[in-house]
Amino acid sequence: MSHTILLVQPGARPETRTYCDYESVNECMEGVCKIYEEHLKRRNPNTPTITYDISQLFDFIDTLIDISCLVYQKSTNTYAPYNKDWIKEKIYVLLRQAAFSPNA
């Protein structure tokens, strides 16, 4: 478990910048999915169930002006930066594991 800070800038204006912190990379990736789910709920307020596929999630990530992670590296006592592509790769792995989990 590595402390992870998610940095998000959805719009062109710097005022849209925000961040969240998580106890692990997986928790952070779940947080990115929740951000997208909240976006879908705002766009479709009368839809009782929100469904989407991974390509739609990745398209949403690509529309963000910036999204990146800072992940704590215990060995150096520093945070390492990771970009959109890394985030998408980690989400893909997380969702694939969830899909093949016996409890899914």
Swiss-Prot record:
UniProt name for this protein: Protein enhancer of rudimentary
Positions of modified residues (Phosphoserine): S24
Stored InterPro entries: EHR_sf, ERH
Disulfide-bonded cysteines: none
GO terms, biological process: 'de novo' pyrimidine nucleobase biosynthetic process; pyrimidine nucleotide biosynthetic process
Any single Gene Ontology cellular-component annotation: nucleus
Gene3D superfamilies (alphabetical): Enhancer of rudimentary
Recorded name of the encoding gene: e(r)
Biological source species: Drosophila virilis (Fruit fly)
